[in-house]
Amino acid sequence: MSERGLLIVLSGPSGVGKGTVRKAIFDSEENDFQYSISMTTRKQREGEVDGVDYYFRSREEFEAMIEAGEMLEYAEYVGNYYGTPLTYVNQTLDEGKDVFLEIEVQGAKQVKDKVPDGVFIFLTPPDLAELKSRIIGRGTDEMSVIEERMAVAREEIEMMALYDYAVVNDEVPLAVQRIKDIIASEHFRVDRVIGKYIKMLEEM
């Protein structure tokens, strides 16, 4: 049986560029991660594809999955649910493959409670002024929503201590390489590999 894969969790405040960084990681030739697509009740944006960017579901469908215990994590953010379906994640980890989650900060806390040996990475902006500029630059939100997102972002940055690593997204290629380096080093941690060597000794 193969070793269980790593659960890699990337999160950070709205507008920090989580989706852009994640897409750059998965577009690279040496990518070997499995992406767990999040589910949301928010409105589908122009250019987004159901089942590729998110699973877009109604509030009623999402709440039924919560009730059935079918979510690894979920959170309500600016009036919409976001979450991670459980079945795919467990099946993929059991196959020895690394699973990459891009989720909200509230959801990451739930995952850490359930999977404490995951790799938790917090993506940060260079500063809050840059973060606000990125959110405004999307052109998808009204000013009242932008201000609400900024207030939530401040609270989320204060939760950085819950994570294992902080990566500044000043330039996407640099942020991508930092994340890849973190994950590569995690595979060599003694507490992750020692079980294999103990088993080898027992079989000698």
From Swiss-Prot:
Binding site for ATP: 12-19
Enzyme class: transferase
Alphabetized SUPFAM superfamilies for the sequence: P-loop containing nucleoside triphosphate hydrolases
InterPro entries: GK/Ca_channel_bsu (IPR008145), Guanylate_kin-like_dom (IPR008144), Guanylate_kinase (IPR017665), Guanylate_kinase_CS (IPR020590), P-loop_NTPase (IPR027417)
A molecular function (GO) term: guanylate kinase activity
Subcellular location: Cytoplasm
Catalysis performed (reactions): GMP + ATP = GDP + ADP
EC number: 2.7.4.8
GO cellular component assignments: cytosol
Alphabetic keyword roster: ATP-binding, Cytoplasm, Kinase, Nucleotide-binding, Transferase
Domain Guanylate kinase-like: 5-184
HAMAP family named in the record: Guanylate_kinase
Biological role stated in the UniProt entry: Essential for recycling GMP and indirectly, cGMP.
Family: Belongs to the guanylate kinase family.
Protein name from the UniProt record: Guanylate kinase
Organism: Enterococcus faecalis (strain ATCC 700802 / V583)
The organism's taxonomic lineage, starting at the top: Bacteria, Bacillati, Bacillota, Bacilli, Lactobacillales
Gene that specifies this protein: gmk
